[in-house]
């Protein structure tokens, strides 16, 4: 089981999330891999999770009727949110809001087929008090097997 150097799923997700709208990251997405990107802003962590899950389903990154795919995506999203929120996913309860760009990538990062598919979720943006100018940059990455 070797992680393929050209198939670093987390790195690809991070580069996609970090790219501004007017720039495209120089990436070679491996054949058969799927991804989507988007933006979400809220004081409600449930809305953040729902927006990313909806994007993944709408862009056929995960199958809507397969529970294990939704479950894997959920855990990758939560892991990425832990990074953005420094381990405390509360937002509105502690008067914090986020404005994030996200990328969700699905693929096979290992050289052995038995290792199966994985999903990576990258988040980049700002977190802070719900007052313009009172935020700072934050980043998070979550990776889970499907």
Curated annotation (Swiss-Prot):
Segments spanning the bilayer are none
GO BP: any one term: positive regulation of gene expression
Q: Name one GO molecular function term.
A: mRNA binding
Its domain of life reads Bacteria
* Pfam family of the protein (one): HutP
UniProt keyword list: Activator, Histidine metabolism, RNA-binding, Transcription, Transcription regulation
Cited InterPro entries = Regulatory_HutP (IPR015111), Regulatory_HutP_bacillales (IPR023552), Regulatory_HutP_sf (IPR036482)
Q: What does this protein do?
A: Antiterminator that binds to cis-acting regulatory sequences on the mRNA in the presence of histidine, thereby suppressing transcription termination and activating the hut operon for histidine utilization.
The entry describes its oligomerization and partners as: Homohexamer.
Query: What is the name of this protein?
Result: Hut operon positive regulatory protein
What is the protein's species of origin? Bacillus cereus (strain ATCC 14579 / DSM 31 / CCUG 7414 / JCM 2152 / NBRC 15305 / NCIMB 9373 / NCTC 2599 / NRRL B-3711)
């Amino acid at each position: 089981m070797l992680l393929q150097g050209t198939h670093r799923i987390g790195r690809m997700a991070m580069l996609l999330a970090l790219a501004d709208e007017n720039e495209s990251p120089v990436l070679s997405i491996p054949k058969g891999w799927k991804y989507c990107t988007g933006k979400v802003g809220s004081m409600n962590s449930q809305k953040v999770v729902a927006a990313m899950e909806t994007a993944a389903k709408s862009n056929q990154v995960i199958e809507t009727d397969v529970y294990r795919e939704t479950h894997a995506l959920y855990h990758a999203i939560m892991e990425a949110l832990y990074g953005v929120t420094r381990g405390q996913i509360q937002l509105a309860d502690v008067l914090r809001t986020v404005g994030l760009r996200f990328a969700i990538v699905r693929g096979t990062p290992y050289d052995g087929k038995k290792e199966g598919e994985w999903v990576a979720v990258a988040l980049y943006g700002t977190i802070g008090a719900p007052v313009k100018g009172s935020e700072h940059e934050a980043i998070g990455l979550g990776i889970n097997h499907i």
